[in-house]
């Protein structure tokens, strides 16, 4: 027998190298085979409910790292709730209608307008479902636990029917109407867009300063006066029908030196404009309030038969321009709102493809709208006073990445103004994480216009509206309920397969159709109406779910997307929000803080991360970042996270190895019988349990990450395990000292494994497979630990906090001795502590082997008054470090004066000799194989 065999060196097959890319799919297969999701739901049946509603990602392409952040975050929450005694099902969903799928088919050479519509829509459907399958596999590879066999998809007939019922309820209340006001129009998509489909980019535009000649000055201005206006969209001058001034603003009539014309501009902008126009000097002829100029008539700059009326508007400012806004009601929301008050013509001179229409004039007809600036400049002639290039923020179609325009076209709208205050009241009842989300959503709802819900596309849910012979729109409850039933049975495809009369209830009549003829709407619904009604199609109808949901969790862009649309439809139909709480997250950027894009080559694929590092590393990264703000990720950052993971894994491996001979049923030492340092660690660990439990409740994953890393590296590795290994290795296997520490080891190991399962499910499942004394087959079926408190807890914490200060001071003294070559390792030291009475009382109260705790071989405690001048001194304590006396014990590696060669060929100290002689009689009788001496 070898001497080292008398040591209790921890043994385990749990590998240091994780091998996550290979092992994780094996665990996922085991979970699926064991129907783990189903079993967890069965375990929690009848318990308090927690229902997170999954915002549906768009079914197109593999998932990106933003998807991963979102789904992993949801998985962490749902897993933590499930393990904390909540009935917490997770039904994943997909958004499956919309333009991107049409664009994919177009790139494949499929021409929608040249084929049967039903056949085309079936191709869209099949493509969408193939993308659902692809993304489902991607999410499962991340270890996300969900009801993957029963997701919701917005193309499902039942979902479509429930969506129609939401529409019908809103129509019944009068919230659906048709109007021809300006909407965001994407010429690249040939469709109207909702606010949620807009993104902004900075672009350069040519702005023009020009003048309209006064035609009828109403006795205030003479006909030799010109009113100066400014535009950043020259094409809209073709549809200009008015000039808007601020009613309370001051305007001056000025005559530049050498000019026979006089001009009207805002007083507050005159100096800057004079510089732009090259007016070296000018004479001020008159001053007027904007309200005085109302109803003055001017001529259109080149189409002089068109009159442009001076009108009043509160949206006019002195921030830029001339203080006078040219007004084209067909091309702007403010223009429309103020123009209709004065009954101005709503002229639209750009078609659905962005081409100038015939009514723009022969010089413009057929030209692309943003290419006509040179023509406008030419037509303005000497009425053009200046032009300049400006850089400004401009709206773009978020899908095609092309600029859009405001354009008045007949559309269907969902009113927001009719019940806006009700929505705002519901926002105030909702909990927001982070808290600033409330203000953001509140302001968006407060300031938004009505919602344009019609789209001029094919792949989507049809608007269930019919038209009588006289043009009356029909969307009564009887009709929409019937359409919903048809969709539920056949899918929305039936809308395109049957004539209008066959889609109406049997025997349906309407006074507007004396001949019994009807037509149907050909527009489809905005896809945000699809996902925005999911509270009805999922939470309100699926078994084991509830409405309103406990939580919606999405990216911060969803304040104007899903959070917004869901809130509108839910309040419209039922008078309350669809959620009790909202959690929003920032965007994922690259390691330099830049947006990810294919062109930059900085995209991080979750699948690539899973192949290189493993999904648990990506999950740990999610827990490590502050998702209240934008977060960064790169392979380098993931490498750093992987290093942190390695530290956690190897620490837990140490605990596994050193509890391999520990049976909790027979070897556990009661808290009252633990050593004081073991009690201290038990208390510290239970504080960690409380911290993590609270952080899960607050959805603060980063707090969990920081707390765990600090506990593992500081409290365990750098303190407790640093000296505890000397006890568990050296003391007799069944000794009280060893079993005490193993009790703490095992308690920490089991509970921290449970606590980490929502974040690192693959790793904790592997650890759990080595814990043979735990009854649950999978850690995911276990319950979360509950933090305990102990008698005299605060006193114990205070005493050990004071010791930690003393320990740090002792380490500084040992380091100085090491630098002075007095010792090498700290175990070579004889440390003398010169202590005040207060420190002596502390050391006595600790009731511990202080030499063991400080990892020195020998320790002496003396009076502070006796400290020599060269002692390393601190307040109340001083240290002298000398080389320990004696030889190194081959077994304990400590220097001890009792160390000597024993008759059984072991060079050991008395303490080790006693352990050997009491526990290894055969080795004592036969002698050990070899000795270093």
Curated annotation (Swiss-Prot):
One of its GO terms (biological process) is isoleucyl-tRNA aminoacylation. One of its GO terms (molecular function) is ATP binding. InterPro entries: aa-tRNA-synth_I_CS, aa-tRNA-synth_Ia, Anticodon_Ile_BEm, Ile-tRNA-ligase, Ile-tRNA-ligase_type1, Ile-tRNA_ligase, M/V/L/I-tRNA-synth_anticd-bd, Rossmann-like_a/b/a_fold. It is an enzyme of class 6 (ligase). A motif ('KMSKS' region) lies at residues 595-599. It is found in: Cytoplasm. Its EC number is 6.1.1.5. GO terms for cellular component: cytosol. Keywords: Aminoacyl-tRNA synthetase, ATP-binding, Cytoplasm, Ligase, Nucleotide-binding, Protein biosynthesis. It holds the Pfam family Anticodon_1. A motif ('HIGH' region) lies at residues 57-67. ATP binds at residue 598. L-isoleucyl-5'-AMP binds at residue 554. It catalyses: tRNA(Ile) + L-isoleucine + ATP = L-isoleucyl-tRNA(Ile) + AMP + diphosphate. Gene3D superfamilies: 1.10.730.20, HUPs (3.40.50.620), Ile-tRNA synthetase CP2 domain-like (1.10.10.830). Catalyzes the attachment of isoleucine to tRNA(Ile). As IleRS can inadvertently accommodate and process structurally similar amino acids such as valine, to avoid such errors it has two additional distinct tRNA(Ile)-dependent editing activities. One activity is designated as 'pretransfer' editing and involves the hydrolysis of activated Val-AMP. The other activity is designated 'posttransfer' editing and involves deacylation of mischarged Val-tRNA(Ile). HAMAP family: Ile_tRNA_synth_type1. NCBIfam families: ileS. IleRS has two distinct active sites: one for aminoacylation and one for editing. The misactivated valine is translocated from the active site to the editing site, which sterically excludes the correctly activated isoleucine. The single editing site contains two valyl binding pockets, one specific for each substrate (Val-AMP or Val-tRNA(Ile)). Monomer. Belongs to the class-I aminoacyl-tRNA synthetase family. IleS type 1 subfamily. This is Isoleucine--tRNA ligase.
